[in-house]
A protein has these predicted regions:
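Positively charged, low-complexity terminal tracts
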Residues: 1-73
């Protein structure tokens, strides 16, 4: 596995969760996954997702965000 390449990092305004996204490249087989890491205090939740799932998840989040314009963060 190659080193993780940072994609994005931000903090959720309301809950304070820290979200990090990294690209994970696996040399054997050419597999690339997006690692989403959510930190809530001392607890971590980690998802490794494939490109198709990332697109589906991202599109769903964009659609929801666009349907709530002007909402406070």
């Amino acid at each position: 596995m190659d080193p993780a390449a940072p994609v994005a990092q931000f903090t959720v305004p309301l809950g304070g969760q820290k979200i990090e996204m990294h690209q994970m490249d696996f040399a054997a087989g050419g597999l690339a996954l997006l690692r989403v890491r959510i930190r809530e205090g001392k607890r971590f939740t980690v998802f490794d997702i494939d490109p198709e799932t990332a697109r589906t998840w991202g599109e769903a989040m964009l659609a929801w965000g666009r349907s709530h314009p002007g909402s406070p963060p």
